[in-house]
């Protein structure tokens, strides 16, 4: 029996979910940029 986690891990390893991960990362970075604004830089 193959679990959903195994399928997800395999797909992620093959790069099928890289675009989703990039979108998530970009959205997080966008939120951080909005929060910091001109007061500081993310280093």
UniProtKB/Swiss-Prot annotation:
GO MF terms held by the record: lactoperoxidase activity; metal ion binding
Entry keyword set: Calcium, Heme, Hydrogen peroxide, Iron, Metal-binding, Oxidoreductase, Peroxidase
First-level EC class: oxidoreductase
Biological processes, Gene Ontology terms: hydrogen peroxide catabolic process
Cofactor(s), names only, from the UniProt record: Ca(2+); heme b
Catalytic activity: 2 a phenolic donor + H2O2 = 2 a phenolic radical donor + 2 H2O
Binding note for cofactor: Binds 2 calcium ions per subunit. Binds 1 heme b (iron(II)-protoporphyrin IX) group per subunit.
EC number(s) from the headed UniProt entry: 1.11.1.7
Further remark: On the 2D-gel the determined pI of this protein is: 9.3, its MW is: 38249 kDa.
Family designation: Belongs to the peroxidase family. Classical plant (class III) peroxidase subfamily.
Protein role: Removal of H(2)O(2), oxidation of toxic reductants, biosynthesis and degradation of lignin, suberization, auxin catabolism, response to environmental stresses such as wounding, pathogen attack and oxidative stress. These functions might be dependent on each isozyme/isoform in each plant tissue.
UniProt name for this protein: Peroxidase
Source species: Cynara cardunculus var. scolymus (Globe artichoke)
